[in-house]
Every structure is written in structure tokens, then in C-alpha cells.
Amino acid sequence: MTQISERFLVQAHLDAKQPRTLSPAEQARYRADIAAELKKQDAVLVAHYYCDPVIQALAEETGGCVADSLEMARFSNNHAASTVLVAGVRFMGETAKILNPEKRVFMPTLEATCSLDVGCPVDEFSAFCDQHPERTVVVYANTSAAVKARADWVVTSGCALEIVESLMDNGEKIIWAPDKHLGRYIQRETGADMLLWDGACIVHEEFKSKQLEDMKALYPEAAILVHPESPEAVIELADVVGSTSQMIAAAQRLPNKTFIVATDRGIFYKMQQLCPDKIFIEAPTAGNGAACRSCAHCPWMAMNTLERTLQCLREGSNEIFVDPALIPHAVRPLQRMLDFTQAARLRQAGNA
């Protein structure tokens, strides 16, 4: 694992712990109390697909949003609520605040970070960019507000290919950060001239190609869905490579009844909701004596619990603040992404 110490990974697991098992009655009480607090505080709950199913269900029940990071950003930007509660990891809360500086933004915990974010410190990244001033800086959404402020473009896995293709068509050379696997995939698909930062996601980097081949042999009729943050050897085995939303769409679209899925298992909630007659299997994250650390579930996403969500609302704790001096610089590449994807949607609608 690059730039992330073993101690940090172990501590992340210790901090996450396993959520206390709640009885059905306790869950119902927490959900009712959270719904009441959201209404009372003019707040909306926005949850990522990788959160635990109970959090995703709560977001849906209360008129919020369950989505990938791009749609979370768009939803927070467009929703009328004065307060946004982001169930996800810290960069998602920061993104909501950057796009909505006038709103109050909270998270169930501020400890929920991301290995990609931590693996791209702004000082080191800025120095890297300064060595290549002729290049356009494109960063993945999984980065800090400070890194976004240093960038020309922010992208998500759902729009990265199209944006890089557009930049390449304009003759631009690119610095890409932080996920090396996603960067390599984009580079291979587009042929763009890209310098890659050396970061990786602790969940997706654990998927194993040899074990995936063995699993495919057990389920020969299964389609393999792979997130592009996965290693290249895993991507090569995929029937579909895409963002969380793109994988969900593929599960709905493809005729296969069984799917092997190489991403965080939190996505199964939405897949099973939309495709109740289909079977979804976790891609293997261990084998040949190797043990998994994340085991197909982000330890930081797991920190978003019902108890922490209610505590956050009642106490007004875990509010997200972003340096006001950074916001004008960080909002520019984010707004470019939103404008680009909105224009692409309109073009697609016009061609429908």
C-alpha cells in the first residue's frame, strides 16, 4: 500500500469497530428519531452507495439521496434544504460544503477519511504539479479541498473518461491524481498523455485476478462488473468497467442472472433493490495465503452508523468547515465538472 502505513490501516479498523448490533425495535426507534430531527432542522440526508444498507434506506425514506459521489454533489447543490448531512467519507462532506458554502454541512463522524485522500498530501502534490507547469491538473473527487483547489478539473469515475477525452482533443497533457489504477485505465482507454500520482484505494486494490478467474469458472454464466479503481489484471477480466452508478445500470441492463462484483459490497443494497431476481457475489479479496484488510467494505464508510447520525443531529457536532480562502479555488474545478456533465446529459437527451 503506497504512502499509507500499516499502523494507519490498523488504526482505521480499530476506530471503525463493528457497529453495535441493534434490535429491530432499536433500529426503528433510531430511524424515526433521525427522520424527526431531519425535518425539524430543515436537513437532508445524502448517502453514498458504499454506506451500510440501513443508512441508505434511511436516506431514501426521508427524501434524501443515495448515489455516487458525482450525484451526491449535484443533489446537495440543487436541494433546497439549509442543512446537508453527508453519510460517506470526509471529502464528500467537504465537496458539499465547497459547493454550498451558505449551508451547514454535517457528517456522522469526521474520522471517516479515504486512503486516496490521505495518500495525496497537498504539499507533496503541489510540488509535483510545480515541476510540470505545462500540464493540466486533473484530480479525482477523492481528494482534500486543498488538493482540489490546486487542480484545473475535478472528476469522478463516472465522468473521468469523457473529460480526459475532451482535454486530449484540445491537445492538453495531464497530471492525474491520486488513484494510479483509475489513471492507468483512463490512459489506456483514451491514449492521453498522463503523469500518474501513486495512490490506491484500500478496498479496490485488494481484488485478486487469479481468484476472480477461479470464481468465474464456478459461475461461468456470471457477468463480471469491475470498478476502475481495481488493479489492471482485475479490470482485464471485466465484462463491464464503470463507476458505481454505471455498474448498477449494467446489472439492470444485462440479461445475466448472476453478477460477480468488484467494488465495495455496500453497493449490493441498491443492486438487489433494483434487480430482486438477480444474484450478486463479492469478487474475491484474498487467496493464496493473503488475508484481506478491507474485505470489500471500506472501514471508513462503516463508521456511518444510526447512533452517530442521531448524535450528530442532536448535538450539532461534526460540522464540516472549509477554509474560506480555498473555496473560490476549489469550487472552480468542481463547477467545471458539473457543467460538463450537465451539458453531456442535455446532449444525450437531445439525441434520445
Swiss-Prot record:
| Top-level class of the enzyme under EC nomenclature | transferase
Q: Which InterPro entries match?
A: NadA (IPR003473), NadA_sf (IPR036094), Quinolinate_synth_A_type1 (IPR023513)
Task: Kindly list the places in or outside the cell where this protein is found, as annotated in its UniProt entry.
Answer: Cytoplasm
Q: Which cofactor does it need?
A: [4Fe-4S] cluster
An example GO BP is: 'de novo' NAD biosynthetic process from L-aspartate
Q: Which residues bind iminosuccinate?
A: H48, S69, Y140, A141, N142, S157, H227, P228, E229, T244
- Pfam families attached to this UniProt entry: NadA (PF02445)
Q: In which pathway does it act?
A: Cofactor biosynthesis; NAD(+) biosynthesis; quinolinate from iminoaspartate: step 1/1
Q: Does the keyword Cytoplasm apply?
A: yes
Please share the entry's free-text remark on the cofactor: Binds 1 [4Fe-4S] cluster per subunit.
Q: Which UniProt keywords apply?
A: 4Fe-4S, Cytoplasm, Iron, Iron-sulfur, Metal-binding, Pyridine nucleotide biosynthesis, Transferase
Q: Name one GO cellular component term.
A: cytosol
Enzyme Commission no: 2.5.1.72
Record field: transmembrane: none
Function noted in UniProt? Catalyzes the condensation of iminoaspartate with dihydroxyacetone phosphate to form quinolinate.
What does the similarity note say?
Answer: Belongs to the quinolinate synthase family. Type 1 subfamily.
NCBIfam families in the record, alphabetically?
Answer: nadA, PRK09375.1-1, PRK09375.1-2
Q: What is this protein called?
A: Quinolinate synthase
What lineage does UniProt assign to this protein's organism? Answer: Bacteria, Pseudomonadati, Pseudomonadota, Gammaproteobacteria, Pseudomonadales
Which gene underlies this protein?
nadA
